[in-house]
Amino acid sequence: MAVNGIIGIKLGMTQVFVEDGTLVGCTVLQAGPCVVVQRRTKENDGYEAAQLGLVEFVKPQRVNKAMTGHFKKANVAPMKVMQEVRIEESKDETKVGDRVLVENFKTGELVDVSGVSKGKGFQGGVKRWHYRGGDASHGSMHHRAPGGIGGSSFPSRVWKNQHFPGHMGNVRVTAKNLKVVKVDTDENLLLVRGSVPGPSGTYIFIRKAKKAK
């Protein structure tokens, strides 16, 4: 199967001893199981892809009529979270109803994990953009203020995307090239080295690294 991605849930973090005895921080991810709900083909849609759905219990009354018909056509149970993933091989035999499991990933390979980061609300420039800040003493009255932005006679305006205080977090972020430390096929668990966007319990999408280093 050429599907190189899977939907999951971030469970939390732990520590694992690797082969050389080093203690590394890892994120525990529940990866799948997923089911192919829809198949996109180059003949009908112009590209090759598969729409995956995460297998978990969903109350039928929480699903609208349009999505109920969509799931009924695929002959699968209603699902809360779905994600479309591209398929590279045009002659791939992936079809509706196929299961996508964590066994598609191997220990030691690199993956990209996408999720929604933790929301921080309105934050200042020091926390949001890592400004150095002003002097902490000697009469300074600007400890955490942004300071000048260099807009005098030129350009006489504020540059677009100028770093200012504002809303921080709660955006979709991708952590790239995370190394798979362990794969547990019995419990559908994937341990990756390092941190992953979002709080525990958030939905994430795992795919094999696009730009592996």
Residue ranges, per PLM feature:
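Extended basic (Lys/Arg/His-rich) segments that typically form rRNA-contacting surfaces
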Residues: M1-K213
